[in-house]
Every structure is written in C-alpha cells, then in structure tokens.
C-alpha cells in the first residue's frame, strides 16, 4: 500500500527486491495502456493479488487472451509474446529470471488489423523499470514503425491512450 503511487503507466511496475542475482520481482498495478508484446527468453510467473487481468499472448502466430483472476497464479512459458492488460485497481506480483549477459528481450508490435508483425525492438535489459518505457516511446514517436507494411493493409497503429 505504501508504494502504490509508484505504479505508473504505461507499464505500472516497481521492482521489489533490487540487487537480487536470480530473479526480478515486481509489483505491477493498473491501469496500464499497452499495445506492445514482451518477448522474454525465460518463463514469467504471475500472481494476481487484486482484481482480474487479461494476458494477451501470441500463440502459433495468432492472438489469444488468457484471463488471470484475483488470487490465481499463471506460469507463462518462455519465448511467448505477451501483453498484460491491467484495469484500474488491479495489483499483481510478477517474477522473471534476471537477464544474463547477452540475453535479449524483445518488444513486439502487431498490426491491429491483420496481425502482421509491425516492429520488433531488441533490448539487453538492465533496468526493467525504465527501459521498457523508453522503447515504447521510441516506437510510438515513429509513424513509419507504426505503419503496416503488408500492401493490402497499410493500417497505422495509434499510440495507446495516455493514462495519468
């Protein structure tokens, strides 16, 4: 409760145990406003403390929604693109494996009209609280990156609604 004010969009995360060698342990609160999909080489553990969330994933090239209800846990398999959608007053605990040197995370954006991969950014993640947000800002600042290159489509992804 003392740190709820730190859970700010677009991601809403706050690392709990900094300096831990093995795990990134975060509390993540809603609402968030995300259109990106995070791709992690390791598994991610979700424990939903308050409220229900939708974890959007890409499975076999197609979008799929997984509901994680309050009190439930979910282990996301490694290398599964995912986009947590958190409503207001939701709080969850998320654990990820700390990145080893050379490991790269990815942020992916898919066309909202045809599901084509619009852009994939690579990060050697050192500070999860700041680097995800910076990569998102770079993507949304570029109309070219947000424009679908499929000739029959050409849709332009609008940036997500900014939340306070």
Predicted regions located by residue number:
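Jelly-roll (double-stranded beta-helix
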Residues: 1-47, 52-73, 81-164
């Amino acid at each position: 409760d003392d740190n709820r004010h730190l859970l700010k969009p677009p991601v809403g995360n706050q690392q709990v145990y900094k300096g831990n060698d093995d795990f990134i342990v975060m509390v993540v609160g809603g609402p968030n406003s995300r259109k990106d999909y995070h791709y992690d080489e390791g598994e991610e553990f979700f424990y939903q403390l308050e409220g229900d969330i939708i974890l959007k994933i890409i499975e076999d090239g197609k979008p799929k929604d997984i509901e994680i209800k309050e009190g439930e846990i979910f282990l996301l398999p490694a290398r599964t693109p995912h986009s947590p959608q958190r409503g207001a007053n939701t709080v969850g605990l998320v654990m990820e494996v700390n990145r080893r040197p050379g490991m790269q995370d990815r942020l992916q954006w898919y066309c909202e009209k045809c599901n084509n991969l619009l852009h994939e950014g690579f990060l050697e993640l050192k500070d999860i609280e700041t680097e995800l947000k910076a990569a998102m800002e770079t993507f949304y600042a570029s109309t070219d990156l947000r424009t679908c290159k499929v000739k029959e489509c050409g849709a332009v992804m609008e940036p997500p609604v900014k939340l306070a």
